[in-house]
Amino acid sequence: MRKILSVLIVFVISFSARAELSIQITQGVDNPIPIAVVPFSWDGAGVLSEDVADVVVGDLEQVGEFRALSPGNMLSMPSEASEVFYNDWRTLAQDYLLVGTINRAPGSQLVQVQYEFFDVNRELKLAGEVLTGSVAQLRDIGHEISNVVYELVTGTRGAFNTQILYVVAENEGTEYNNFRLEKADYD
């Protein structure tokens, strides 16, 4: 308990000092890994609140080690292994390919996200899984897929599900300082 209290005091003191740390990453590696993340097909009604493929692309490009192919430059839009033509992706100089579908889970309000991840040059499926969750969890599912892709390609465990806790000070300089604990996605 004393350790937790000590850590909280350090946070409060550091926030009251009004020092702001800003880290800006302006470039990644010299030769980012080319990857095609095909927009996931959706077999349900309406539009989903979160685009899983966009979440994955955002995660992978944010670390600077990957360069995603724009959907407008794709020769086809496969959503499962049987629709993948490796020559198309080699022509586009892509090393990896991620495809997927999103469906309503039978008899529930949940959705099932099925994805498949391929090594284009070796014509090999590296991973595939069905993840189930609510529509509100689609972003988290996208982060989980990003973790799998990142680890398979780099050998390093992905950290895209990481959440950060931080303290926000309100009413500073007044008689009544309020502090609020906030939780944020890594991105």
Regions found by a protein language model. Name each.
Residues V120-N121, D185-D187:
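Short loop/turn segments that connect beta-strands within beta-propeller blades
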